[in-house]
Design a protein with these regions (language model features):
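An acidic/histidine-cluster motif and surrounding catalytic segment
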Residues: 1-90, 94-254
Length: 254
């Protein structure tokens, strides 16, 4: 299974982090050049996006989020063009497990058409997974169907097949939702089910967001600068991010 790593050209620190891991773990990967939404002009955004949605949800469809949606769309297009049965779409701020190659090999054999597999996911509630669908994977992880897939978020790492990739591209051209609004893609019948790997084998790296949901670009840059200049602030912020996302990955069996 090929991995499609999304990375902004200027994010050299992130690329170095990811390439060191992928090479060490012997993962077949290609780099997908991410699109920096903050560099898109008004005319470009108007031509690439559903402006009714951008106007209605400016906090979510921010320039950074629009760039992320375009970047994920490009990664999905690369998968389709490569004629891969399925592939891993991966963002560039992740700590990978040492057994990732084994996990991907198992998931490739278990992948079924018209589904999405989330290796990293987030939910605003205790997320229910269907016990009768669970399949054991390396190191105590289990792959199971979500009972409430519409509540799932995060596009940090997911496995997708060609048919689902094509439908997601079609549904989000022009960009009308963020790259991780799986509820919208489910409603549009891009996939029939979502399976989650629980607990998630991926961890977020302690790197500031390059997207900046719901923040002004200047404030995001200022916060980044402060965290880099003041190690204690950076450590505290990193711990808060880790604790926050850990709370959003709790699940229960039903």
């Amino acid at each position: 299974m090929k991995t499609y790593l999304i990375n902004l050209e200027e994010s050299r620190r992130r690329r170095a982090l990811m390439e060191e891991q992928l090479i060490r773990l012997q993962i077949d990967y290609v780099i997908v050049p991410a699109i920096n939404g903050h560099r898109l002009g008004v005319a470009e955004i108007s031509s690439l996006c559903n402006m009714d949605n951008v106007s209605k949800y400016p906090e979510w469809l921010s320039p950074g989020a629009i760039g992320a949606a375009l970047s994920h769309r490009l990664a999905l297009s690369c998968l389709v063009e490569d004629d891969e049965r399925c592939g891993l779409i991966l963002e560039d701020d992740v700590i990978l497990p040492n057994n990732l190659a084994s996990i991907l090999e198992q998931l490739e054999s278990l992948y079924v058409d018209d589904e999405l597999i989330l290796l990293y996911w987030s939910s605003d509630r205790m997320h229910p997974l269907r016990r009768e669908t669970a399949v054991s994977i390396d190191n105590g992880h289990e792959l199971a169907v979500s009972s409430e897939p519409a509540s799932l978020l995060s596009a940090v790492g997911y496995i997708v097949g060609k048919s689902v990739a094509r439908r997601i591209i079609a549904l989000n051209t022009p960009v009308r939702v963020t790259s991780d609004l799986w509820a919208s893609f489910l409603e549009g019948k891009a996939m029939k089910q979502i399976r989650c790997l629980a607990p998630s084998p991926l961890r977020l790296a302690n790197l500031p967001s390059d997207i900046g949901y719901g923040r002004q670009h200047f404030l995001r840059r200022a916060k980044h600068w402060l965290e880099m200049k003041l190690p204690l602030i950076h450590r505290l912020s990193a711990r808060r991010r880790e604790a926050y996302f850990s709370r959003r990955q709790k699940y229960t069996w039903v």
